[in-house]
Amino acid sequence: MIEFIEIIKSIIFGVVEGITEWLPVSSTGHLILLDEFLKLNTARDLGAAFAEEYMSMFEVVIQLGAILAVVVMFFGKLNPFAPSKSAAEKRATWSLWFKVCVASVPAAFIGIVGDKLLEKATGKDIDGWIYNAVTVAAALIVYGVLFIIIEKWQKNKGGAVESVDAISYKQAIFIGCFQTLSIVPGTSRSGSTILGARMLGVSRPAAAEFSFFLGIPAMVGASLIKGYGFFDYVSESGVSVPVLAWVVLAVASVVAFAVSMVAIKFLMDFVKKHSFAPFGVYRIILGALVLIYFIPKMV
């Protein structure tokens, strides 16, 4: 019975990840909140330290399911070896990949080098300093307001850049710098990159699409780092990870993949007719609710 309940919980986590990873509303923020109300007990019998390590890994690694959805849905566009593509189309695909790689450098530097330097200097990594409810709420609200402001500012302007292929390397780097902001929980990786793109006048569909592609190296890299860290912890502690813990992780990842397919299709259809402002309103409301719920518990 306990195993069944944990699997049901993992399905819920997968659904939330699949929806919120691609909508600009912060998947990490939602998973933090979900863990507050619906804790996975899969690893808690092995102690608080192990449970914390497991959940930290779980919340990142299930993103692999979500990112696989992007690869599947945009495989034709992302595959430079497709025999049906002309030489010019193949060059355009390689150019897109180079832009994605270049745009990923700032976030990779901050996420790996900056995190290590901070931990060495203070004894705590970035998560240790900013991973809390107040930070999540503040980020939700601040970026919600920014979405509304930028969408209003761009309302009467045509998209200067109508496709991802038209994004320049300079613009790609600018958008990549915005991705570094997502290191703050509650910001939203997709939200920060979409904001950066919209500030440059990139059309909504192109901004969303480029954000999806930027997620591939970012999320694969983060998952590998977290996964390695977890296995290193398990190796040093000598803890035997229960089979249920792996089953729960696998189920959540598969569900995240399936739900992501729907969420991506929804967002691409939505932004062809509407602005990102409704997501800004949602973020502000959610941020306020987080403050109302958590502040009394912290006093």
Give residue spans per PLM region:
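Multi-pass membrane proteins that catalyze or facilitate reactions on polyprenyl-/lipid-phosphate substrates
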Residues: 1-299
